[in-house]
Amino acid sequence: MSDTEDNKNKQTTRRDFMVLTASSVAAIGAVCTLWPLVDSLNPSADVLALSSIEVDLSNIAVGQTVTVKWQGKPVFITNRTPDKIAEARAVKMSELIDPEADQARVKAGHDNWLVTIGICTHLGCVPLANQGEYDGWFCPCHGSQYDSSGRVRRGPAPLNLAVPPYTFISDKKIRIG
C-alpha cells in the first residue's frame, strides 16, 4: 500500500512539473511574441528628433511673422508691434467666438512674441499672415479670420489657433515642444 501511495505522489509531482514547464514555455513565448509589437508603439528616432526644435528670434523684425516646421506642422512666430498688442488686449471677450485673453496666449514678459500652430481649426488649411479684416490671419479655404493674437473672429473655425508648448531659453531663443 505504501508503494501505491508513493506512485500517486510521484505522478502528481511529475504532472505538476509538466504543467509548470509548459506554462513557463508558453509565457516566454508570449513575451517574445508581444515584445516587438509593444516596442513598435514607441516613437521612431526621426519623430523623437523632431519632437522639439530651437528657434533663434534675433532675425525676426518687429511686425514680422516667420513660419517654422515642428512635428510636420507649420508654426507661426510673430514679433508683434506695441500697437498690435494693445489692439488685441482691447478686444472684449464677448466679441470672440472662442474667448481667450491675449495675455493667456503669450508668455509673461515676452508679450510681443506670439507662437501659434499655423493650421486653421476648421478643416486644417494653412492661414495667410497679416491678412483679413483683423490684420491677423485669413484662411483662404473657407474664410475664417483670426486677429493679431490668433483668436478666431469670424468664419466657420470653432477654435483659436493653437499655441504649442514652448519655453524661452533666452530672450532671443525659444524651444518649441
Swiss-Prot record:
Record CDD domains: Rieske_cytochrome_bc1
Catalytic activity annotation: a quinol + 2 Fe(III)-[cytochrome c](out) = a quinone + 2 Fe(II)-[cytochrome c](out) + 2 H(+)(out)
Xref: Pfam families: Rieske, UCR_Fe-S_N
InterPro entries according to UniProt: Rieske_2Fe-2S, Rieske_2Fe-2S_sf, Rieske_Fe-S_prot, Rieske_Fe-S_prot_C, TAT_signal, Ubiq_cytC_Rdtase_Fe-S_su_TAT, Ubiquinol_cyt_c_Rdtase_Fe-S-su
Cofactor: binding details: Binds 1 [2Fe-2S] cluster per subunit.
Cofactor(s) needed for function: [2Fe-2S] cluster
One example GO MF annotation: metal ion binding
Coiled-coil annotated residue ranges, if any: none
First-level EC class: translocase
UniProt subcellular location: Cell membrane
Start and end residues of each Rieske domain: 88-175
Keywords assigned: 2Fe-2S, Cell membrane, Disulfide bond, Electron transport, Iron, Iron-sulfur, Membrane, Metal-binding, Translocase, Transmembrane, Transmembrane helix, Transport
Membrane topology: Single-pass membrane protein
GO cellular component, one term: plasma membrane
Transmembrane annotation, as ranges: 18-38
Disulfide cross-links: C125-C141
Residues the record lists as binding [2Fe-2S] cluster: C120, H122, C139, H142
EC number: 7.1.1.8
Recorded family membership: Belongs to the Rieske iron-sulfur protein family.
Subunit structure, as described in the record: The main subunits of complex b-c1 are: cytochrome b, cytochrome c1 and the Rieske protein.
Function noted in UniProt: Component of the ubiquinol-cytochrome c reductase complex (complex III or cytochrome b-c1 complex), which is a respiratory chain that generates an electrochemical potential coupled to ATP synthesis.
Extra remark beyond the main annotation: The Rieske protein is a high potential 2Fe-2S protein.
Protein name: Ubiquinol-cytochrome c reductase iron-sulfur subunit
